């Protein structure tokens, strides 16, 4: 009998409630795990196409923080065992070929996974597959792109043939069914030969004389001054330049602003290091914010890194990437030109440094005058001297922090000298954002006012709580009294009716006569009238 009886509703609700609680706890656990896991930092590069018909391409590095997915345990373990590594920058010549080696952990899972080589394309920055192990090759790369997988060695090799300037871009070398699961970025640059033309002029009796590229004048360890002009041609700015030694100084005027450009190179054969610096005599601007862009050039196996700062009217930030327009405006322009001879391959660093007109002191006075940070330019300079046998190396670092319309540009600072001096206060200010702390009686008064408000609110809340409790107690007592009084009023009333039966023998004579006269005849019928209970 009990087995056939249906289950109670309460027993049916128990499994559903347990299931809901389990799902809720699992969700909270996953969310907690993903929030506690530190974000992974992945550095990649993007290409910014300038609006010129000569395809000038500028490469800038961006650091992106990618947070892990909620399935952190499985995803992190998978990425830890399947870490990819390989070259970050690959350079080739027009018509030549490049080979990229992508290494991965030789596990049983990775051996059977899909390997791919894809290219990021604008405007959505979707990575389009070029070639993969699924026997797929993009139509534009057929016959000149190949991918070979070597599972035993944990390596797959990508080879691109017949390179052209159109192949310059950002690529991905990865593993997985999708092109955004596990990968690392590779920058491919194609060199079309020397595209920078240099004109050098040496002074003779106070008048400049034009000299051909490559002409070097040396007088012991002396310096040679002249006028240097760099013309940008087609192709990317990862180009080769003709080695030239000398020093050039140029003073030009752009809307009343003077710019002094200096490029220095030691004479080869002295065993000394090269130095490159720029001293700009520019008043503190209040107009458009500056934007730094970097380029690199090479001279017959020696890579040179130079920094160029120019004024941009606006800087915009979009989803997933940072873009800016850098037109050649009338504003100040600083440029570093560092050249080295192929006979002395060594590290060469060229950076920019402001002059004494834009110094730390002026910047802090501007901040104390409560000038808006979005309309000023903070320049912090640092000079480091490293000893050398015959000459000294000057490494000037400069960080420009500016913003317009609430957006800011963060500059990264890298020191490539072999020896560095201890950090100075200006270097500490360059290393991170500037925080201005305000101390004084205003801060103390604000703190005292906040404490007094807290002290006042605490007793008021306590008194209100006590009053509420007392009111509830009184209300409960009054309700109890009303209920007891109503119960007392509802006491039942009993009415006793006593009926006495008189026998006919014991009736008096008058009563007998009255009874006989009132008796009905035996044939008569007694009719009882009933009252209608309805109104």
Swiss-Prot record:
Compositional bias per record (Low complexity), positions renumbered to this chain: 208-220, 241-253
Effect of residue 519 to A: Prevents receptor internalization
Glycosylation sites: 187
Major localization listed first in the record, in broad terms: membrane
Bias (Basic and acidic residues): 330-346
Compartments it resides in: Cell membrane
Molecular function (Gene Ontology), one example: IgM binding
GO CC field: plasma membrane
Quaternary structure note: Interacts with IGHM; this interaction facilitates the endocytosis of IgM-coated microbes and IgM-antigen immune complexes.
Protein name: High affinity immunoglobulin alpha and immunoglobulin mu Fc receptor
Lineage: Eukaryota, Metazoa, Chordata, Craniata, Vertebrata
């Amino acid at each position: 009998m009990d087995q056939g009886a249906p289950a109670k509703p309460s027993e049916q609700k128990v499994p559903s409630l347990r299931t809901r609680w389990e799902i809720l706890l699992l969700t909270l656990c996953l969310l907690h795990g993903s929030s506690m896991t530190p974000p992974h930092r992945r550095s990649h590069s993007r290409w910014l196409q300038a609006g010129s018909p000569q395809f000038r391409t500028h490469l800038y590095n961006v650091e992106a923080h990618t947070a892990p997915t909620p399935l952190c345990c499985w995803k992190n373990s998978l990425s830890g065992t399947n870490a990819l590594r390989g070259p970050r920058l690959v350079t080739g010549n027009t018509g030549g070929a490049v080979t990229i080696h992508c290494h991965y952990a030789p596990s049983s899972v990775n051996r059977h996974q899909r390997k791919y080589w894809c290219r990021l394309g604008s405007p959505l920055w979707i990575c389009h597959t070029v070639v993969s192990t699924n026997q797929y090759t993009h139509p534009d790369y057929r016959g000149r792109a190949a991918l070979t997988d070597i599972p035993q060695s944990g390596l797959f090799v990508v080879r691109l043939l017949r390179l052209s300037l159109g192949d310059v871009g950002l690529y991905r070398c990865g593993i997985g069914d999708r092109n955004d699961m596990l990968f690392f970025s590779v920058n491919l640059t194609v060199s079309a030969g020397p595209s920078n033309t240099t004109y050098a002029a040496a002074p003779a009796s106070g008048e400049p004389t034009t000299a051909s590229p490559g002409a070097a004048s040396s007088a012991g360890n002396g310096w040679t001054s002249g006028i240097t002009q760099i013309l940008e041609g087609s192709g990317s700015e990862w180009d080769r330049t003709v080695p030239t030694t000398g020093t050039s100084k140029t003073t030009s005027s752009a809307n009343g602003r003077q710019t002094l450009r200096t490029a220095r190179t030691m004479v080869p054969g002295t065993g000394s290091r090269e130095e490159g610096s720029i001293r700009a005599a520019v008043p503190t601007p209040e107009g458009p914010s500056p934007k730094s862009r970097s380029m690199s050039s090479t001279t017959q196996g020696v890579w040179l890194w130079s920094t160029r700062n120019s004024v941009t009217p606006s800087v915009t930030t979009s989803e997933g990437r940072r873009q800016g327009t850098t037109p050649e405006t009338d504003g100040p322009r600083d440029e570093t030109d560092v050249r080295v001879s192929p006979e002395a391959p060594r590290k060469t660093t060229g950076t920019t440094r402001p002059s004494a007109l834009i110094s730390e002191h002026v910047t802090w006075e501007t901040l104390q005058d409560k000038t808006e940070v979005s309309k000023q330019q903070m320049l912090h300079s640092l000079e480091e001297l490293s000893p050398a046998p015959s000459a000294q190396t000057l490494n000037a670092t400069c960080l420009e922090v500016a913003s317009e319309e609430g957006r800011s540009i963060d500059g990264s600072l890298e020191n490539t000298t072999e020896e560095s001096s201890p950090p100075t206060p200006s270097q500490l200010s360059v290393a991170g954002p500037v925080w201005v702390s305000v101390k004084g009686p205003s801060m103390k008064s604000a703190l005292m006012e906040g404490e007094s408000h807290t002290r006042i609110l605490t007793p008021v809340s306590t008194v209100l709580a006590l009053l509420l409790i007392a009111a509830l107690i009184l209300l409960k007592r009054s309700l109890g009294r009303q209920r007891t009084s109503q119960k007392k009023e509802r006491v039942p009333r009993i009415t006793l009716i006593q009926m006495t039966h008189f026998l006919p023998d014991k009736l008096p004579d008058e009563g007998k006569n009255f009874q006989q006269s009132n008796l009905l005849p035996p044939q008569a019928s007694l009719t009882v009238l009933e009252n209608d209970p309805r109104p």
